[in-house]
């Protein structure tokens, strides 16, 4: 039991923001993309693997809604599902990501098939969705606070990719532009929930560990991509050049 006095809301927020030092914007794979050193294959591999993350975000948010008894929270949180899945008659973030895939030369059907998703990426994303299903709704909601750092990473792509990768169709950048505003809005709500819920030192320490868990997920995804697309050591590379890994097991 931790009997230390809790951090004030301002101190707690500062501790949360300090975790940005471990955000995946600092991963060598992302740095290479930002600095224009990534190959076409590396860009395509990143887009294809991140698509698995994109299609699972609504599943994560649906789990939070299912576990949340607070109607007012649900009313606001449901916007996240609409952002990704799209409102009736409107496209959402998933369609925008498919257009990004087309912009970098990938076929939308291939993206949807998830055949390019590396096992390490799949395991990381699945761990996040399963956490959201099993944790309290407050803990699952607060795990989204890597969004504190998201506007910077979206802006970095908008600032650097058009210059370094003229072969990418600019229409594909719609997702990043849209998420700039959405992420800032989502941060306000997620941060309010987090600061209100974690009022003991023990709870605050747990939340910082939850945020680190989410940072680990994002970093591990890029580690898997580095092995496959930078070091040319995808799964089973020593025994076959074929993509023999599983494509997802429906349960």
UniProtKB/Swiss-Prot annotation:
Pathway(s) the chain acts in: Cofactor biosynthesis; pyrroloquinoline quinone biosynthesis
Highest taxon of the lineage: Bacteria
Keyword terms: Oxidoreductase, PQQ biosynthesis
Function, as annotated: Ring cyclization and eight-electron oxidation of 3a-(2-amino-2-carboxyethyl)-4,5-dioxo-4,5,6,7,8,9-hexahydroquinoline-7,9-dicarboxylic-acid to PQQ.
Family: Belongs to the PqqC family.
PANTHER family xref list: 4-AMINOBENZOATE SYNTHASE, PQQC-LIKE PROTEIN
Family annotation (HAMAP family): PQQ_syn_PqqC
NCBIfam families linked to this entry: PQQ_syn_pqqC
Name of the protein in its database record: Pyrroloquinoline-quinone synthase
UniProt organism field: Pseudomonas entomophila (strain L48)
Highest classification ranks of the organism: Bacteria, Pseudomonadati, Pseudomonadota, Gammaproteobacteria, Pseudomonadales
């Amino acid at each position: 039991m931790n009997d230390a006095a809790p951090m004030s809301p301002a101190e707690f927020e500062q501790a949360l923001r300090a975790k940005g030092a471990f955000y995946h914007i600092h991963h060598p794979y992302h740095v290479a993309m930002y600095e224009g050193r990534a190959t076409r294959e590396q860009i395509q591999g990143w887009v294809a693997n991140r698509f698995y993350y994109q299609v699972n975000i609504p599943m994560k948010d649906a789990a939070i809604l299912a576990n949340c008894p607070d109607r007012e929270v649900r009313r606001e949180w449901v916007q996240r599902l609409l952002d990704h899945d799209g409102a009736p008659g409107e496209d959402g973030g998933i369609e925008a990501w498919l257009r990004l895939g087309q912009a970098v030369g990938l076929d939308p059907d291939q993206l949807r098939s998830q055949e390019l998703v590396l096992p390490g990426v799949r395991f990381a994303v699945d761990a996040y969705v399963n956490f959201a299903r099993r944790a309290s709704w407050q803990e699952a909601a607060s795990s989204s606070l890597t969004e504190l750092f998201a506007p910077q990473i979206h802006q970095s792509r908008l600032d650097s990719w058009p210059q370094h990768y003229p072969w990418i169709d600019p229409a594909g950048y719609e997702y990043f532009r849209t998420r700039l505003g959405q992420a800032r809005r989502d941060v306000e709500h997620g941060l309010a929930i987090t600061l209100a819920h974690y009022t003991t030192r023990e709870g605050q320490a747990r939340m910082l560990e939850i945020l680190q868990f989410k940072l680990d997920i994002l970093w591990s995804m890029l580690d898997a991509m580095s092995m496959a697309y930078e070091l040319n050591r995808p799964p089973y590379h020593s025994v076959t050049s074929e993509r023999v890994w599983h494509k997802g097991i429906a349960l």
